[in-house]
Amino acid sequence: MLKKEYLKNPYLVLFAMIILAYVFSVLCRFYWIWWASEFNEYFFNNQLMIISNDGYAFAEGARDMIAGFHQPNDLSYYGSSLSTLTYWLYKITPFSFESIILYMSTFLSSLVVIPIILLANEYKRPLMGFVAALLASVANSYYNRTMSGYYDTDMLVIVLPMFILFFMVRMILKKDFFSLIALPLFIGIYLWWYPSSYTLNVALIGLFLIYTLIFHRKEKIFYIAVILSSLTLSNIAWFYQSAIIVILFALFALEQKRLNFMIIGILGSATLIFLILSGGVDPILYQLKFYIFRNDESANLTQGFMYFNVNQTIQEVENVDFSEFMRRISGSEIVFLFSLFGFVWLLRKHKSMIMALPILVLGFLALKGGLRFTIYSVPVMALGFGFLLSEFKAILVKKYSQLTSNVCIVFATILTLAPVFIHIYNYKAPTVFSQNEASLLNQLKNIANREDYVVTWWDYGYPVRYYSDVKTLVDGGKHLGKDNFFPSFALSKDEQAAANMARLSVEYTEKSFYAPQNDILKSDILQAMMKDYNQSNVDLFLASLSKPDFKIDTPKTRDIYLYMPARMSLIFSTVASFSFINLDTGVLDKPFTFSTAYPLDVKNGEIYLSNGVVLSDDFRSFKIGDNVVSVNSIVEINSIKQGEYKITPIDDKAQFYIFYLKDSAIPYAQFILMDKTMFNSAYVQMFFLGNYDKNLFDLVINSRDAKVFKLKI
């Protein structure tokens, strides 16, 4: 009897659904923990390392907050939202720092089930919410960006807008004071957590205003909700925002009759004018330029040089095909189609769900802006599928028993989740760095000072700063080609040029932090160098850096290290592109070749490589299509650490070299095809061959995974 009473209590049923969905989401994310724990190379400091490159930026910020300080201009994320939350969790919980950053996403991202279930409950459809929560919490795109070890702001980047959507729908349906104050609260939290959400928040508030004008134009509480929400978009300090919002909320709650539509109109107009004057549209324009129109601001800033745009090389902002798009959102194409149909049906039944359109549309921008956006559509489409399944059950109940209907729904849910389970099983993401790489960088921390710089590619900027506690020129947050030009140049040009550019770029970068806002150092460091060295032709200036008699007039203020990891060989052609571009035209008109490969097959005296090259078994030539190309030399590398290699000359007039790596830390880089330009690059000569000028560099860390050189000039 007591059991039946519990089952009849809607709040207990709702609570049980939330707990079950949350536990389900967490357990699914623990699969990666179980799998990764089998590999010792994924551990550092007795804990699994994280799998998110950007996560190291927030980890560095949290580490510095725990220490209580950081170096000026070190690009630390000190005080950022995720770093701050991590700091407080470290202070109030008994867990280690490494454990906190590993598991935060596991537990926080699973909170998405709460607003989904609560939202469906507003429509008196608990089954819709429960099924949607199960699907949304582990759908491919959402799982990939919130799995265990994915330490990033993505862990709440969908949770918070779903709470905003829930309170908007609740406001429409109930018109209650709780929703009125909760709505701006969650918008404010979302903006603090993820400042790039500004555009989405504007879209949500704008649509809410339009909805109000169409369906509730005579109800004052909706206009007050728009005003309070809009105030969170302002650039004033949060405590001023909070004070104004609380005062206006209290005035409305206590003096509704005196706040007539004229006063509300004046308040609304004043709020709008204030937002425009405070630069409220600037964040929207930036997001559109970078992700949709793919513009690189560096060309505008420099008014001269046209650099390579880094967002063209990031997988997250590449366009995706429609099948992949559907799978990422709903786990499979068929579930996506059912979800889309269900969402349209849901809109027809409950017009307030139109408030979900900005979130859904942002996810659909993945077709143009890249796969990273698909995560936004996941919960909205899941609600559509949940609604469809709840309607299907209603039809079944009319024809069959309750038991039969429940069995059918359970079976359909399992079938829906099956592709997602397969994806979770197959998606075995490695940690950002291996244990050896992390240990090497931790060793560098004991060699370098906090004010010293490490010159390396931007992919490694955040981890290098976290493990070595140094400064870097670039990192995952620098998306302008003008920043990445310098490390690209230092790694892909000859040693002399690399040494000179490393010193110049670091010293000029430091000077730029203290330059006036209108100084050329703020807009383009390369142009500032040319100005100081009385050079007007960029090609001549860059060529002069290769000359031994080039004199650096800039005073040396700190030590500089070059970090050259083995893994960079997989992307070195991309790395080099940033400095081989024609700075006058923005066109990559200086062709070069650097291509890693592994053997696929051997037949008829030929070795078929993974990059499409067919290599003769005597290594004297290779074929690309029908073209046969001679090889200059074969370089057999027996030990990268010891610098043991053998060069076999073949044709001194040929332009290409074949590297055969017998000692490789990268499993998919057994062969490297490169031309003379790349062969003479600092990365190839110093890392693979161990050839470096002792007057320019000292080798301070040496392994087959990575080498670190200290600049002596």
From Swiss-Prot:
A Gene Ontology cellular-component term: plasma membrane
Position of sequence motif WWDYG motif: 457-461
GO biological process: protein N-linked glycosylation
Positions contributing to [alpha-D-GalNAc-(1->4)]2-[beta-D-Glc-(1->3)]-[alpha-D-GalNAc-(1->4)]2-alpha-D-GalNAc-(1->3)-alpha-D-diNAcBac-tri-trans,hepta-cis-undecaprenyl diphosphate binding: 194-196, 291, 372, 462
Keyword presence, Glycoprotein: yes
Catalytic activity: tritrans,heptacis-undecaprenyl diphosphooligosaccharide + [protein]-L-asparagine = tritrans,heptacis-undecaprenyl diphosphate + a glycoprotein with the oligosaccharide chain attached by N-beta-D-glycosyl linkage to protein L-asparagine
Residue window of motif MI motif: 568-575
Motif stretch (DXD motif 1): 52-54
Name of a matching Pfam family: STT3-PglB_core
Feature type site, description Interacts with target acceptor peptide in protein substrate: 54, 316, 328, 571
Domain of life: Bacteria
Positions of transmembrane segments: 12-35, 97-122, 126-144, 153-174, 177-192, 198-215, 221-233, 238-254, 261-278, 325-347, 353-369, 374-396, 407-427
Impact when changing residue 569 to A: No effect on catalytic activity
Motif stretch (TIXE motif): 313-316
Stretches the record annotates as Interacts with target acceptor peptide in protein substrate: 457-459
UniProt keyword annotation of Glycosyltransferase present: yes
Gene Ontology molecular function, alphabetical: glycosyltransferase activity; metal ion binding; oligosaccharyl transferase activity
Cofactor entry: Mg(2+); Mn(2+)
Keyword set, alphabetical order: Cell inner membrane, Cell membrane, Glycoprotein, Glycosyltransferase, Magnesium, Manganese, Membrane, Metal-binding, Transferase, Transmembrane, Transmembrane helix
Intervals, Cytoplasmic compartment: 1-11, 123-125, 175-176, 216-220, 255-260, 348-352, 397-406
Gene3D superfamilies: 3.40.1380.40
Outcome when changing residue 52 to E/D: Strongly reduced catalytic activity
Residue ranges that the UniProt entry lists as topological domain Periplasmic: 36-96, 145-152, 193-197, 234-237, 279-324, 370-373, 428-713
Comment field on protein domains: Despite low primary sequence conservation between eukaryotic catalytic subunits and bacterial and archaeal single subunit OSTs (ssOST), structural comparison revealed several common motifs at spatially equivalent positions, like the DXD motif 1 on the external loop 1 and the DXD motif 2 on the external loop 2 involved in binding of the metal ion cofactor and the carboxamide group of the acceptor asparagine, the conserved Glu residue of the TIXE/SVSE motif on the external loop 5 involved in catalysis, as well as the WWDYG and the DK/MI motifs in the globular domain that define the binding pocket for the +2 Ser/Thr of the acceptor sequon.
Protein name (database record): Undecaprenyl-diphosphooligosaccharide--protein glycotransferase
Organism expressing this protein natively: Campylobacter jejuni (strain RM1221)
